[in-house]
């Protein structure tokens, strides 16, 4: 049976920053919703790319050795595997992350 997911309902339940919550699975991929508030430490993922989609708010992704990436609502970016990055937000922002199920959102 097809799944209907109310993303905004999940947003209203989010309280803790930097604690991604799985909201859907598609094959071997997972969609996680996260509240970004402040800055997450620099990290990387050795085995997989990571996609950030800004649902609400704005984030900046610091990328080691490259210009910062600024994402506003409706924008997304793919961070390739092995690229050190650090997402941050000045105000609470809600992000959808599309990634392999086995990926540790906190990095290697």
PLM-predicted stretches and their roles:
Residues 1-32:
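A short, N-terminal "cap"/entry segment at the start of jelly-roll beta-barrel domains
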Residues 30-46:
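Conserved short histidine dyad/triad with adjacent acidic residue
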Residues 27, 55-56, 72-73, 91, ...:
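A cytosolic small-molecule/anion-sensing beta-strand core signal
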Residues 34, 54-55, 62, 88, ...:
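Beta-strand residues in well-ordered beta-sheet regions across diverse protein folds
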Residues 65-81:
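Short acidic-glycine-tyrosine-enriched beta hairpin
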Residues 38, 47-49, 53-60, 64-65:
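Glycine- and acidic-residue-biased ligand/ion/polar-headgroup-sensing regions
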Residues 30, 39, 58-60, 84, ...:
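Structural motif
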Residues 81-108:
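Ligand-binding loop in jelly-roll beta-barrel domains
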């Amino acid at each position: 049976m097809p799944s209907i997911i109310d993303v905004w309902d999940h947003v209203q339940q989010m309280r803790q920053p930097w604690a991604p919550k799985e909201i859907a699975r598609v094959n071997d991929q997972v969609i996680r919703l996260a509240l970004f508030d402040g800055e997450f430490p620099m990290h990387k993922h050795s085995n997989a790319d990571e996609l950030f989609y800004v649902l609400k708010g704005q984030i900046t992704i610091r990328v080691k050795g490259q210009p910062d990436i600024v994402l506003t609502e409706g924008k997304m970016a793919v961070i390739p595997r092995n690229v050190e990055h650090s997402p941050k937000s000045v105000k609470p922002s809600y992000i959808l992350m599309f990634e392999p199920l086995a990926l540790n959102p906190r990095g290697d």
